[in-house]
């Protein structure tokens, strides 16, 4: 949930500015975010692992195998999804209401608040999409978190572990709880 809050705050703002502003390379940035929506989580985990490993550029922070590393990996996974989907909704809303905003000379921040309020339900759906991607993620979380009991073990990694150990009933029970979330 922390990863969703952190990444969505910045992603919605970036999606908003991509929708409203015209600038050089805008289309390339949009294509990049759309492509990153499908990045394999294991690749994200591997990149974060290399960054946070002892010999990596951020190794001095000693974040590997901590919940913070898991939040970083999940934030990176969620970020392009929320940027791309919020860009789409804001660009549609902007085309619909652009003349009204310009006629009343509403500033950028006021425009953002109005568009967020107008598309609130869709934004909640976007956030739930990001949350679903984060909560169902196994690979990146296992790589950077280490699946340490009572510290970095989450439901998806626990399901994987219990299945490998042959505790299929317990793994299925965890899976049902995960679906109900």
Give the residues covered by each predicted segment.
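Membrane-water interface segments at the C-terminal ends of transmembrane alpha-helices
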Residues: 1-91, 118-138, 171-181
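Interfacial helix-capping/hinge residues at the ends of transmembrane alpha-helices
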Residues: 14-15, 45, 98, 141, ...
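Juxtamembrane helix-boundary/capping and inter-helix hinge elements in multi-pass membrane proteins
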Residues: 21-26, 91-96, 106-108, 147-151, ...
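Short cytoplasmic-facing helical segments at TM-TM junctions of multi-pass membrane proteins
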Residues: 85-123
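Interhelical loop and adjacent transmembrane-helix boundary motif
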Residues: 142-180
């Amino acid at each position: 949930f922390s990863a969703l809050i952190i990444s969505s705050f910045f992603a919605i703002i970036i999606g908003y500015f991509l929708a409203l502003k015209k600038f050089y390379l805008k289309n390339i940035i949009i294509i990049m975010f759309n492509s990153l929506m499908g990045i394999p989580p294991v690749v994200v985990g591997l990149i974060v692992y290399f960054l946070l490993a002892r010999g990596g550029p951020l190794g001095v922070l000693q974040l590997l195998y901590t919940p913070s590393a898991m939040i970083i990996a999940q934030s990176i996974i969620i970020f392009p999804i929320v940027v791309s989907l919020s860009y789409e909704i804001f660009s549609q809303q902007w085309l619909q209401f652009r003349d009204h905003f310009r006629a009343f000379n509403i500033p950028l921040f006021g425009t953002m608040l109005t568009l967020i309020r107008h598309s609130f339900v869709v934004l909640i759906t976007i956030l739930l999409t990001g949350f679903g991607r984060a909560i169902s993620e196994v690979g990146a979380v296992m790589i950077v978190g280490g699946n340490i009991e009572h510290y970095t073990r989450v439901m998806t990694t626990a399901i994987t572990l219990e299945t490998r150990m042959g505790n299929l009933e317990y793994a299925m029970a965890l899976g049902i709880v995960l679906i109900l979330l």
